[in-house]
Structures are given as C-alpha cells and as structure tokens.
Amino acid sequence: MAVRARDYWDLTKPKVVALIVFTALVGMFLAIPDMPTWLQVRTGALGFLGIWLAASAAAAINQLLDAKIDAQMARTSWRPLVVGKVQPWQVLVFAGALIVISMTILVVWVNVITAVLTFASLIGYAVIYTVYLKRATSQNIVIGGLAGATPPMLGWAAVTGLPTSADWINASLLVLIIFIWTPPHFWALAIFRRADYAKAAIPMLPVTHGVPHTRKQILVYTVLLAIVTLLPVTVGMSGVFYLGGAVVLNAVFLWYAWRMLNPPDELFSMKMFGYSIVYLMALFAFLMVDHLLLPWVR
C-alpha cells in the first residue's frame, strides 16, 4: 500500500501541534520588549519551524509506541499506523528525519539552549510520558504535562537565548499556566473516554479513582489555573487588556468545572474539553495582543 502525504501528516497530530506552536509563537513575541528586529524575525521564524518539526516528531513517536493501545480505543483506532496505512519502520524513519532537521535548524541557525530544551521536551513526551508515566500512574498527565507545557519557553529561548534570570522567570510563568491547565483539560476527555482507557489498561484518574473524584480534581486545578493566570499581570508582563480577557475566560472555565460536579449529561465533559482548548488559545492570544497592540492600556 502506497503511503500518502496525508498519512504522514496525520502522524504529526496537526491539531495538537498547532496549539503547541501557537503558544511557542506567543512566547517569542512576549520575549521582545519592542518591535522585533529583522534578525529576531528571522531567528524566530527558524525557531518556530524547528519547534514545529520537533513537536511533530514527538507526535509520530508517540503513535509508534502507542500503536497497540490506539488499536483498542475508539478515539484513536483510525490512526495511520493502526489501520496499516504506514509501517512502523516508516514512522521511525519519518520521525527520525524530523528530529535531525529540527535539531540542525535550532543548533545552526537559532541557539543551543533552544535545541537542548526542545530535545528534552521531545524525550519527555515521546519517551518518558509515553513509555513509562502513561502506564505507571494515575498522575501521568500531571507529571508528564511538564513536557507539553514548555513550548512558550522554547519560543522565548529562540529569540533571546534566555540570558537573564528575568527571562527564565517570565518564560516559566507561561509554562506554569499550561502545566496547570493540562489536568482539567485532559481529565475532562478522560471521563468521557474512561471505558476506552480501562479497556487499554491505562490508569487514567477516572479509571483508578472514579469519576466523582476526578471531577473534584478538575475543580481544584481550575481554581489554581485562575490564580496562576493572574501572575503575568503581577510581574508586569501583561496589562489590563490581558487581565480583562483572563477574568472572563476563567469565569467560564470555573463555571464548567463547577458544573462538572453534577453535569446535566454524559456529553458535558466533552463540552468542557472543547472549551478548554478555546480557553488556552484565547488566553495566549490575549497575552500577545496585550503585548503588541495595546501598550497604551497598561
């Protein structure tokens, strides 16, 4: 069977990676106090490409290592490797090529610190989370979420090299937002798909501790998220435009989390899951707009 370009594209989890690289892009813009220079634009564009390719490689490796699990779950049973559209060796070669190209771009044309952090994130998700954490503990998403939370720092590093402690602190605040966002985001999906995870013997929180406990944890993390998203304002990274947007977004997210304690139907968790994606995209969009377009409201 001939492998189509679309099959390779699907291996990269394009929708997931799009959100990842968007947060990296926002990290780049926030790292630059004024309008970027031509050198920063060029470096940022190459950094964006390198991060995107690395994230795509991580997604492909994840599908390679999770093929048996994916075959048992309705949500993932269509993936190219599962249905035989691609062979394992083709996935391995494809992912390896993406990694080589990504690291070459980052080391040669961006900077070494971005390459190191990007590679560490790739290993954290594609290997440590996929091979060990996912199968070992109900806190898999909490611990493994750190690897998926690093893109804003990768973007920040690409255009600055993280030369000062302030750069590290500010970039880490963006990482913290995604890190705290990940559990309520993914647990909402896991509640709806808990039968699939149980069938595949994956110890997701709804499987190991039950749905009521998971709903309470979603509320706890959503409250923490609402607090953490105020930190960019307290350190002067963002102003009132971002603050207003964050307050509205958090109010809706908190309503979903509270309603999850006694949801109207089984599909409500998927509604919260869908909103969580919109939430993160909008939150980072507010960060970027506040930084670039509305300096006069600070």
Swiss-Prot record:
Locate the transmembrane regions by residue number: 16-36, 45-65, 93-113, 114-134, 141-161, 172-192, 223-243, 244-264, 277-297
One Pfam family this sequence matches? UbiA
Q: Which domain of life is it from?
A: Bacteria
Q: What class of enzyme is it?
A: transferase
Question: Which pathway does UniProt place it in?
Answer: Porphyrin-containing compound metabolism; heme O biosynthesis; heme O from protoheme: step 1/1
Principal location class: membrane
Which reaction(s) are listed as its catalytic activity? heme b + (2E,6E)-farnesyl diphosphate + H2O = Fe(II)-heme o + diphosphate
Q: Which GO terms describe its molecular function?
A: protoheme IX farnesyltransferase activity
What is the membrane topology here? Multi-pass membrane protein
Gene Ontology cellular component annotations, sorted alphabetically: plasma membrane
- What Enzyme Commission number(s) appear in the record? 2.5.1.141
Q: Name one GO biological process term.
A: heme O biosynthetic process
Question: Lyase as a keyword?
Answer: no
**Which CDD domains does this chain map to?**
PT_UbiA_Cox10
- Which purpose does this protein serve, as stated in its record? Converts heme B (protoheme IX) to heme O by substitution of the vinyl group on carbon 2 of heme B porphyrin ring with a hydroxyethyl farnesyl side group.
Further remark, if any? Carbon 2 of the heme B porphyrin ring is defined according to the Fischer nomenclature.
Instruction: Enumerate the PANTHER family for this protein.
Output: 4-HYDROXYBENZOATE SOLANESYLTRANSFERASE, PROTOHEME IX FARNESYLTRANSFERASE, MITOCHONDRIAL
What the record says about family reads: Belongs to the UbiA prenyltransferase family. Protoheme IX farnesyltransferase subfamily.
- The entry's protein name is Protoheme IX farnesyltransferase
Q: Which organism is the protein's source? A: Xanthomonas oryzae pv. oryzae (strain KACC10331 / KXO85)
Gene name for this UniProt entry: cyoE
